[in-house]
């Protein structure tokens, strides 16, 4: 068996095209373009690349993109004041704080300061709580993007044994909520899990988000399973590898996401979707 690739790059491009068309319709109706404010603190090279991609995406679809690039010694109270200012700005529909932040800053406090209706990353406790209560509003971008990738396969998720490897607030925990909502029997594994291989071997669907290159071995994959690899780990030779051993896994799985070109583009596309949703349904 050779797995079919789930092409996140192409699916994300289609989403951007649809959003661009909707923004053009808004402008023709005399409505403003959606606005996204991105806050970048410090000069982390990877963060700078990610933010540049997000700004390019905004430009492509016709959003109003507002950049706030701040020095690494920015104080917590100054960031909170900036968020308050953006909360009150009617031209801004979404506020994004790029992670990781310098160690002296409290990310949780910053996320909670963002108004829930402008929390386009989906990290605010209100939005996570709505997802847990089966009433999602602004959904965390990476899990939301993964659900779109899964929908593209046409596979019925109801009743599947799903295993999420990694329990972060950004991916693992909200991913488990999304899969429960989709009717999966969901297990979350983490750093204290015993015998990870045993859990993965029985999974019809496995989502891996740990940041550990090749953590999940190809031989663990159940024949015919769906494999979603969220990891993107740069090697010393410049290659980008995922958290799953791709080649042997693709010989056993029915569907698999590539790294790069799988989950990453979908996270960015869903950020745009959330911003458009906030503009049209929460702010217009």
Swiss-Prot record:
One of its GO terms (molecular function) is methenyltetrahydrofolate cyclohydrolase activity. Signal peptide: none annotated. Disulfide bonds: none annotated. GO terms for biological process: L-histidine biosynthetic process; methionine biosynthetic process; purine nucleotide biosynthetic process; tetrahydrofolate interconversion. SUPFAM superfamilies: Aminoacid dehydrogenase-like, N-terminal domain, NAD(P)-binding Rossmann-fold domains. Its EC number is 1.5.1.5, 3.5.4.9. GO terms for cellular component: cytosol. It catalyses: (6R)-5,10-methylene-5,6,7,8-tetrahydrofolate + NADP(+) = (6R)-5,10-methenyltetrahydrofolate + NADPH; (6R)-5,10-methenyltetrahydrofolate + H2O = (6R)-10-formyltetrahydrofolate + H(+). NADP(+) binds at residues 166-168, 232. Keywords: Amino-acid biosynthesis, Histidine biosynthesis, Hydrolase, Methionine biosynthesis, Multifunctional enzyme, NADP, One-carbon metabolism, Oxidoreductase, Purine biosynthesis. Pathway: One-carbon metabolism; tetrahydrofolate interconversion. The keyword Endoplasmic reticulum does not apply. The keyword Cytoplasm does not apply. It holds the Pfam family THF_DHG_CYH. Catalyzes the oxidation of 5,10-methylenetetrahydrofolate to 5,10-methenyltetrahydrofolate and then the hydrolysis of 5,10-methenyltetrahydrofolate to 10-formyltetrahydrofolate. Belongs to the tetrahydrofolate dehydrogenase/cyclohydrolase family. PANTHER family: C-1-TETRAHYDROFOLATE SYNTHASE, CYTOPLASMIC, C-1-TETRAHYDROFOLATE SYNTHASE, CYTOPLASMIC-RELATED. Homodimer. This is Bifunctional protein FolD. It comes from Stutzerimonas stutzeri (strain A1501) (Pseudomonas stutzeri). The lineage of its organism: Bacteria, Pseudomonadati, Pseudomonadota, Gammaproteobacteria, Pseudomonadales.
